[in-house]
């Protein structure tokens, strides 16, 4: 397997995708190393991600996975790159407007090449600057509702659905979420001490509350055992590029079968975090703070409302007849 670097990536592109439009001078940058600024530094934490561009507006993202994660000590199978390419292909057939275009899938070298969407901005950093995204709730909800419904058994033939779940079992990466989200919470890492001893003790008092432990293990079991659809798995504000009218979703390597509600809950948790940050960081006027926090809170409600709206639209159009004619089934999904 070739390991891509800034020095050899152009020869790799010329050999594998000679039709890709690039004209000298060509610039190669590595995402995640601070080469491009925070507005486009969305990926590159676990993988090697390059931006290759020229001065005439052609720009591409080249992503390679290796066994050893870029910024973590643990090892994961590099075939996650192939799974990500395959799920992007599938989701591009469902919601092409929200998925970057794909130009190459190379499973031998665990590489794929896709559209550079950095003409948009990562919403995490823009929210830190108090930016509003008027279409985020509607577009984000449509992306989730469509990709969830059309990879569920409500739509797919049962055999095809089971094959899809088996193919995207993703045994190694799902453990990252099963443990990282439900077990390794605040107070379990030495970095938490940076917040100060009083805050650390306060958080530990919550973490070790018996009822909380009971509830999170219940949720973990539900997450592990209820495979309703192929989730994104890592749908948060650093994996969504947007502007006032467009949205693109990246970093889909964590896809596997799980409950419908997980992705929606994950992005809502991120927005709650943004609202907490906005409640305490400096604003030029207190009314601006209140307005921005109110916007973030309303975003949570709108995401859920639009998700249900779109999901029900797809249900009415394409759900299997046996589900459609079962009185109350559709409505029960929103409870």
Model regions and ranges:
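ATP-dependent phospho-/nucleotidyl transfer catalytic cores
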Residues: 122-143, 153-232
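Conserved NTP-binding catalytic cores of kinases and kinase-like/nucleotidyltransferase enzymes
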Residues: 1-110, 244-247
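Active-site activation/catalytic loop segments of kinase-like enzymes and analogous catalytic loops
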Residues: 86, 262-316, 335
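Short helix/strand-bridging catalytic loops that position acidic/His residues to coordinate divalent metals
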Residues: 71-73, 123-133, 249-256, 284-291
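Conserved protein kinase catalytic core
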Residues: 69, 121-122, 240, 257-259, ...
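Active-site acidic catalytic loop and adjacent metal/ATP-binding pocket
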Residues: 38-54, 60-62, 216-262
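Conserved ATP-binding subdomain of kinase catalytic cores across diverse folds
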Residues: 59, 65-69, 73-167
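All-alpha amphipathic helical-bundle segments outside canonical DNA-binding/catalytic cores
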Residues: 316-335
